[in-house]
Amino acid sequence: MTDSVVLQSAVRVPTPPPGTSYSPQPSVSRKRSPPSRSPSPRRRRSPPGDSLKENGDAPRIDPERAVERERQLAERLRQHEKREAARKPMTEEEKQAAAKAEYEKLLNMRSGGTYIPPARLRALQAQITDKNSKEYQRMAWEALKKSINGLINKVNVSNIKFIVPELFGENLVRGRGLFCRSIMKAQAASLPFTPIYAAMAAIVNTKLPQVGELLLNRLIVQFRKAFKRNDKAVCISSTTFIAHLCNQQVAHEMLAAQILLLLLHKPTDDSVEIAVGLTREVGQHLEEMSPPIALAVFDQFRNILHEADIDKRVQYMIEVLFQVRKDRYKDNPAIKDELDLVEEEDQITHRIGLDDEIDTQDGLNVFKYDPQWEEHEEAYKKLKAEILGEGSDDDEEDEDETDESSDEEEEERQMEIKDQSNTDLVNLRRTIYLTIMSSIDFEECCHKLMKISLPPGLEPELPSMIIECCSQERTYSKFYGLIGERFAKINRLWSDLFEAAFAKYYDTIHRYETNRLRNIARFFGHMLSTDAIGWHVMSVIHLNEDETTSSSRIFIKILFQDLGEHLGLAKLQERMRDEILRPSFEGLFPLDNPRNTRFSINYFTSIGFGILTEDMREHLKNLPKPTVPALPARDAESDSESVSSHSTCSTCTGSSRSRSRSYSYSRSPSRSRGRRRSISRGRSYSRSVSGSSRGRSYTPSYSRSRSPVPKSRRRSVSYSRSRSPAGRRRSSVSRTPPRRVRGKSYDSRSPSRSVTPPRRRTSYSRRDRSYSRSLSRSVTPPLRAVDARARGRRYSSQSLSPPRRRAERSVSPQRPPPGRRPRGDSLSRSPSPPPRYAREQRRRRNSSSASASRSPPHRDSNRRRSLSRTPPRRGRASDYL
């Protein structure tokens, strides 16, 4: 019961004093008072607050949190006071004090300071203007450290001449510790840049020797510590830097000799390796400045090589070192030409021994307050002006001297080029040829060719020699294709040169025999299939009958066959249809001229690449059928006029003049062989004026004639004037220039196909093209008899006018030779009589003639000879006599 009572009680039991306990005792030893008969006193319940305080289950208050709340409250009050104070204008002293306090607080934080935005930091620094204050000097120190570190990190061979003046712009006297620490750290991180850092240190040493001495002291101490700790990496970096400082004559060569003897005194693998590296860097300088030291060092190496028990790798390193010495350090010069920036007489050499007591002045690495800060800054400004001023004058003098010397060198070089240009080119080609021929595989060949120094402007010789060597092989070797591919993919320069070589060799491919041509084509096929050169080079190819030769067509054939082998027809077709490259293939697949398109289709089909011509075939099918120049156009219109004859008749009292104009519209579908028929529609207007009765008669006539179309379609325009005397004969003068046999006819409106039987008289005609308004296609055989006055060509056609009873002769002022047959277009539509001879039947030609006669109609004439220009049939020479 007592346990249950204790558990249910809400009253905290007080802590017992030491030595006592409230643990329950045995019931025997416990004494109880006798029960009281009086009633128990009345108790009051305690208030809730008191009970919670006395309750053991209530949460206890954390004193640390209470302290934190009080601190935050105080901070808020302080911020409130600051805001209240900020409302009031602050004096300059108060601003300075506030800025200094804030800056000091940021610098003294345990984490090194929190990040401050640059704008806020600049504003904070701008508020601190007291140069004698510690805060201002600390800010200047931080800025100096960042500037020196940044300049050292970005120095290289090309900009060292510009970095050094900027470096002198900083206070290197105050920051010499920062300079030495930064340059040693950068050199250890990048050993290949050691010559550059040594050159920079040498330049600084000429003006500020204390900086160079401090750097050398720290390097020696660093080497000592690393040697004792067996730190190989630090030893290598330190000895490399010391070696290049010896080359620049900042350190004496005796220091390098001491280090070498120390490393080789008790040779181990690591010490010998470090000594070999140091000797390779400083060996040439030792050979020049102290030959006995160099001899002693190499004797020690020789003894180690023969006697010491060292690793094979280290033995090989020593052997390589002796080979480097034998080659006179051609790959390890003491000072490179671009880093030889200091004259020997200007350099200050520090003689510091390896065992000397050295003070590294580590206190220069950290900030220290300088009470005379302004005086020291002014002193360095004067020193800087002196250094940079002298440097600028020297630079100007050096520039003048270099300009003069460069002009002289250029003149000498030009003279040398003029004297030895051909020799140099031959030597270069010989070197490239021997390099290619002596290589085992293409990778070795590319490696050797990359080492060849090509003179400026002779870079195209390398691709040219590769292609020439490839062409001289009996069969194509993939060796050359792989070389060209590797060079084209290494640099864009070689890719452009190979593309230019493609255009050059395609233009001159006719100079090569078939075997060399095949090798060149396969070489470029390999280059194109591997995308080593761009496919746009094919824009130089124009595949047509006029711009290609047999050699170029063979070249294109072999090229596409090689592309088909490497890519396959499907991929090759896809490449040829590439929208980006399509303009470059317009010459290969021409669409501008149907003749060129057919030629390209036939060419690719003949070499087995007809699949590439599908687009051209489709284009050719979809072309509108053009008006063939040799065929008369359908629904074409032609106007023809012929001024026919001015004739006078002796029996008549007056003169008669007649003019006739005939306009015809013809439709003549032509066929290839056999009889060709044309349906022509003509309309003629005739106007006749006679002496006795002057009247005008316009006689529109429409006629249709079907006559065979001659093979040669010609167009002629004739102006004829005929004068008919009163006698039997009428003479007509025709100004009809004859037409050529092979010509083109344009705008023939009425093709008439009439064959006129041969006449008895013959007229001589010139071989020339005749232009007449009378367009006819009738074949007129020559006359049999020769008339002295009739020297022109006669053209006969059947017109709608009544036939004359008397024959008239036409005399032409021009005398065409009888060899060729002129063209004539006739608008007459009367059916022509059939030819009388079988020869006329075989040789009849289709012609469209439009004739307009200006002779008055005569009723008493049985046969009519008009002055139309109808091509005669082709006969023998005897027919014209």
Swiss-Prot record:
Subcellular location: Cytoplasm; Nucleus
Region (Disordered) location: 1-98, 387-420, 623-881
Assigned GO CC terms: catalytic step 2 spliceosome; cytoplasm
Domain MI: 427-543
Residue ranges of domain MIF4G in the record: 145-328
Gene: cwc22
Descriptive protein name: Pre-mRNA-splicing factor cwc22
Sequence similarity: Belongs to the CWC22 family.
Annotated organism of origin: Aspergillus fumigatus (strain ATCC MYA-4609 / CBS 101355 / FGSC A1100 / Af293)
Basic and acidic residues composition-biased segments: 51-98
Purpose of the protein: Involved in pre-mRNA splicing.
